[in-house]
Amino acid sequence: PFGPQSYEHSQSSDIGIVAKMFPDMNFLVYHSSFVGGNQEQEFVDGSGRDGIDTLIQSLVDNEVGPNANVFAELGSTWRFLMRDPDNAAHALGKLLKYCGEDNVLWGTDSIWYGSPQDQIQAFRTFQISEEFRDRYGYTEITSELRRKVFGLNASVPYGIDDVEIQ
């Protein structure tokens, strides 16, 4: 969301509804419904939390499973999350768990922030702690998963042949 103007129209509470109605159409959620200033936590069904949890609640309520037709893009999101490992772990952990490991896409919004090199380096070394993986069911960020997020996952929503990416 960008500022208070029409804030309710920038929420993702309707994504699950339309994703279920149109299963052959892909939905790309820029910024992954992230709201700056929110402290990310474990998703709790029905909690009514804003931001990423709004997107996840919509998917859960409408039975849109992981790796379906909803893609979460990390532009601007990772830039703010990378400074706080626990916040980053919850945000990425939830997106990978509920949107799916094949449906989280890299983005930097570097047009606003300049070189994305710090974001790239931070993501290349970031790991969700074993404690968070055990406690919340988050996945380990492997080299293969990084490759998928950094580019391979974009093949479906952008209609690019996997061979072209290799």
PLM features per residue range, with description:
Residues 81, 112-113:
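Alpha-helix N-cap/loop-to-helix initiation residues
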Residues 94, 98-105, 113-166:
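Mid-to-C-terminal alpha-helical segments outside catalytic/metal-binding sites
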Residues 109:
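Active-site glycine-centered loops adjacent to acidic/histidine catalytic or metal-binding residues
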